[in-house]
Structure formats: structure tokens, C-alpha cells
Amino acid sequence: MEINGAHKSNGGGVDAMLCGGDIKTKNMVINAEDPLNWGAAAEQMKGSHLDEVKRMVAEFRKPVVNLGGETLTIGQVAAISTIGNSVKVELSETARAGVNASSDWVMESMNKGTDSYGVTTGFGATSHRRTKNGVALQKELIRFLNAGIFGSTKETSHTLPHSATRAAMLVRINTLLQGFSGIRFEILEAITSFLNNNITPSLPLRGTITASGDLVPLSYIAGLLTGRPNSKATGPNGEALTAEEAFKLAGISSGFFDLQPKEGLALVNGTAVGSGMASMVLFETNVLSVLAEILSAVFAEVMSGKPEFTDHLTHRLKHHPGQIEAAAIMEHILDGSSYMKLAQKLHEMDPLQKPKQDRYALRTSPQWLGPQIEVIRYATKSIEREINSVNDNPLIDVSRNKAIHGGNFQGTPIGVSMDNTRLAIAAIGKLMFAQFSELVNDFYNNGLPSNLTASRNPSLDYGFKGAEIAMASYCSELQYLANPVTSHVQSAEQHNQDVNSLGLISSRKTSEAVDILKLMSTTFLVAICQAVDLRHLEENLRQTVKNTVSQVAKKVLTTGVNGELHPSRFCEKDLLKVVDREQVYTYADDPCSATYPLIQKLRQVIVDHALINGESEKNAVTSIFHKIGAFEEELKAVLPKEVEAARAAYDNGTSAIPNRIKECRSYPLYRFVREELGTELLTGEKVTSPGEEFDKVFTAICEGKIIDPMMECLNEWNGAPIPIC
């Protein structure tokens, strides 16, 4: 065990003494300046969350996981849990002596007649019973704990996902390697062989309260090791295996294990199933939280938002590190953004007629996401401590020649961390839903079409309407899942386990929440890309309309019937202002319709000029009113064709104005969705449904392919806000 970083194996021993500020006892080293470990816990929180996520990803991608008992990481657990991954596990040979020393101690103490829980006694509330048949006791332990239900129907599965089982196996090996559990090293090698050969025991999905550890599910790993006839496993190609077939495929030639005293208890009395699944959940949650930060910034881009919401002073005055980092990341994405430059020009037009600030879903996104990131980060560190902890009972202290009866099997850090993480996930999902709802609503989205429809005929295209309904469903379920699990504890096992952590149940519910957040992230990301493309189309259509209006104005309004300069020539500048101010998608499907605002406002410009033309209006030659009919007729003859030509050029990828997203730091994410995954602009004119495109992105997120383009968006970020000048 260690606190200051210098490991002392259980087999050694030195007298208690002070040395270099540390307190050394027979089996541990305690930092005298941090005896309660608060300082070490705080030290782990230094640096940015993004850097921590990058480290997780780097660990996830390493080809080998070296286990020694105290350095296992969330990223490594996630890597091993991934089905089909080629990552291998290697055990530290230096741990062998300590592991075997504790195993030998158990045998020696039993032979001496020492009374130890689970070695010579019954279990739990029946620990008053005694036996000298330690081997038979371990066999009975595994038998009665095999109480899970798998079911035989095809439509429902009551089997723990294989990924979670692999995570549990890895964590259990790691915790047993520290040499306080009384189990042979050979058993840990056998579990490692199962992992390295992609052989996964079948564990029940339910049936554990994660105190005393995950007894029921872990007993099925022990059942496979001992060759119980009811034990099952799945091979590398998904084939069902018996215990005998599993041993053969794993290359374990020693045969089934006859568990020695304490070994069955060592295998089952730990929190590995709950903490293993929690590790998987937190790896994905950390990635999705960074994605939410980036999407909030891109949301600001496509909404033509005001970037001052990321100003460093605002967040420095609030002091919360999660908020400061979230704002700094968004600030980095928006810094130099071509969309923000365009938005600034837009906001400078008629500023007194527009809202002074954006709505909360945009403007307070750093304040909203920051606390969630802090919660997720603390939960990550808590679970990382848990997977490197010794979690069974009793603990074998060879150096003091005693078995210590305690309660490290209580998985409260898992239950609490997972409940908190689930709340954070629900909050991220709620923000995403609020942002999505603004994006698809033409009353809020600064000129984008309702439902992000992209067809020429909006009456036959309802865009993301179905997706918005689905998002409401996702968000509702996510908020329901945010309810705590740990407040539903029941007294168990004859009131011996009268408080219990429900760690795995909470981990399972959090895993469900992560899946739903992935659905929401997928839908929102595709909608963001749709909005990017609609902004691109909007810019090309607006320029086309401006050019056409300018040409028609020059042709019709510049001169009179005799070629003389006409007073109406001064209308052109104001006509172009109308085009700049009018939202393109309010008229794009029929630009010359008298019921649409473009023609109405262009006509009003000419009328206003006529009203100030004074006496000249009485003369038909100089009258501006007389020009209105000719102007509109010429516009109707030309504009629809030009707008259709601009749309056709856009569809063919030959637009005159390139897509602004290519000039933005958020471009790698857009490129990934559009080019690498092959999604396209959704319209009612095409057969492709939104769900088909969502599936492509969802699969990519589940496979971790979103990580690289996401990180590429932040490659240039230096880990700090932009300096205040």
C-alpha cells in the first residue's frame, strides 16, 4: 500500500520510524504532510480537464496494459472492455511474491488453528458457524452465490454485457495483485489468459448490491475457474463455450482450480463489476462532455451569436475552474471564426431593433457545463482510486501476522460517483435539447428555416421535426434516469448488509444515460451540420438576390424613357439594404411572391423615395411611382431563374461563395460528419431519412471515431483563456 507514491509490498516489513518527513510502518508509507490523502486527491485535479481526457485517450490506445495493482487507469479499463480490441494484459512479475505470501499465510494460519472470517467461519450473518474444511467452504460459497438469472428468451437478455465483464475481470485482477487477499498468483494469470484470448464468462446482469462487493456476478467468474457445470463463457467469435472449452482456448493447461481457503472469498468479495462498468461509463462521459463544449461553440457560430459570452473576465470573476475551462475552449473555437465576423456585421445593422444578448442556452453554456465537468472529473478520480484499491474482507496483513476484518467491499464511492455523474449527464443533455430547440425554431434561430428544412418547397419538407420530437423523448428519459439510485437501499442478508452501495445498479443506470446522451449528441451534431450548410446556401442565395436586384435597378430605375437620368436611380442603395436585412428563407421558395416580405419591402423603398420626390411625381416622365410596375415585372422575369441557378450550383458543389466553416476551428468536426461518414444535407426532395444519417454518426461515436476530429478542433488551444488586452 502507498500514499506518497512509494509502494511497499505486503511481504516486507520495517519498524515504524520517521524518514524524510514520512511515517514508515511495517507495511505502508504515509506522507506525514498528507496523512489523510486529501492532498494527493487534490493534486490529481491539477491541470486542465481537456489534458486529462487526452491522457485517457492515449492510455486507451496503448497496445499493452501493465498491471501492478496501483496504476490502473480509466482509459486502460475502457480499452480492455472494448470487444475485439487487440490490447493485451501483462501482470507485473514483482507482484508475484506479495500475492503468494498472503496465500501462504492463509494456509499456514488455518493449519495453526487461527479463526478467520470466510476461512473457518460461515459468511455474513451466519459467520457464527465454524468449519475446518476450508476447501469445501469455498466451493459452497461459489455454489450459493450462483443465484443469478439469465433467462432463455431471445427478446430479453439478463446477461451482463461482455464489455462490462471484461472490465470487471481486469479490475479484479488489479486489486488482487496488491497481495492482501490470500489468493494464488496462478489464478490471476488464468483470468488474464481469458482476457488475452477474448474469452468472457457469462455474468448475470442483476443481483448485486455492491456490498459485500459484487458477490453474485463475481461468483460466475469463480464458477468458470472452478469448472462448475452451470458456468458458461463466450469465445472470441461469439460462440458459446463450456468451462472445459474456455480453458482449452485460453491455453490454461493446469485444469480447473480447486480453491484453497479464502480464495473464493477473494474472487467474489470486491467492487470490480460496479467500478469496472463505472470506468467504461466515465471514459465515454469525459469525451462527450468535451464534445458538448465544442458543440456549444459551433451552436453560437450557426446561430450568429455574440461571442462576448466567453470573455475571460466574466468567468474569472466566478472562480469555478470547470466554467473557466469551458468558456476558454468555446472562446478558442470562436476566436477568428468566419461566422463570428459575419455575425458582428449582422449585429451592427439596426442594433437598437435586436436583442442585446443571446438566450441562456447559448450565453450561459459555460456556466451550465462547468459544474457538470467538475462533477464528472471528480467522479473519474474517485473511480480511479477505487479500481486501484483493495476491496475485499478480511485483508491479509502478512507483516503484522493478522487478518483484518473491515468493510472495503462497500462500494459507496461507485454509487455516489455514478449518481452524481448521471445528474451531470442529464444536465448536459438538457442544455443540448435547449440549444437544439432554438436551432430548429425560426422564431429564435436568426434566419434559418423552420425545422432546418432545405427543400425548394417548404410545404413538402418538415426537416428535423421528427428529430425534435425524438430529442424531447431522449431528454425526458435522461432526466428520469437522473434520479438517485443510492437512496433506494434495502437491508439485505438477514440485516447484516443493512446498508449497501448499489454501485453496479447506479453504474448500469449511468451507462443507460450515456447511451441516451450519445443519441442526443448525434442528433444535435447532424442538425448543426445541416445549419452550417443552410448558412452556406443562405449566403449564396443572398448574394444572388443582391446581384439581381442591383442589375434590375440599374436597368429599370437609372434612366427614363428618353435615356435621361431618373430620380429613381437613388433607390438602388436602399433596395440592397433590404436584401441585406431580410432573412433569405422567408422568401427563398418564391422570391417574387407579393405575400412574402422581400417584394413588399422592395416596393416600400420605391414608394418612400416617391413620397419624397415631391412635385416631380406629378410628371409621368420623372415619377418614381410609375417605375414600380416595371421594376417588379423585370424582377419577376429574372430573379426566380437566378435563385434556382444558385440552388443548382449549390447542389452541384459549385457555389460562388465557399462554405465559411472551412475557415473555422470547428471545421474538423463538420468534415468528419460530412466527408468521412458520408452524410449529406437532408431535404424532403431526397429519399434519405434523418434517422439513416443519425445512425452513421451514432455508430461512429460509439466506436470512438469522433475523438480525433473533436481533438483536432482544439489542437491549437494552449490550455488558457485568451489574454485580456
Curated annotation (Swiss-Prot):
Pfam families: Lyase_aromatic. Belongs to the PAL/histidase family. This is Phenylalanine ammonia-lyase 1. This is a key enzyme of plant metabolism catalyzing the first reaction in the biosynthesis from L-phenylalanine of a wide variety of natural products based on the phenylpropane skeleton. InterPro entries: Aromatic_Lyase, Fumarase/histidase_N, L-Aspartase-like, Phe/His_NH3-lyase_AS, Phe_NH3-lyase, Phe_NH3-lyase_shielding_dom_sf. Optimum pH is 8.4-9.2. There is a cross-link at A211-G213 (5-imidazolinone (Ala-Gly)). The keyword Glycoprotein does not apply. Its main location: cytoplasm. It is found in: Cytoplasm. Pathway: Phenylpropanoid metabolism; trans-cinnamate biosynthesis; trans-cinnamate from L-phenylalanine: step 1/1. SUPFAM superfamilies: L-aspartase-like. (E)-cinnamate binds at N269, Q357, R363, N393, K465, E493, N496. Optimum temperature is 46-48 degrees Celsius.
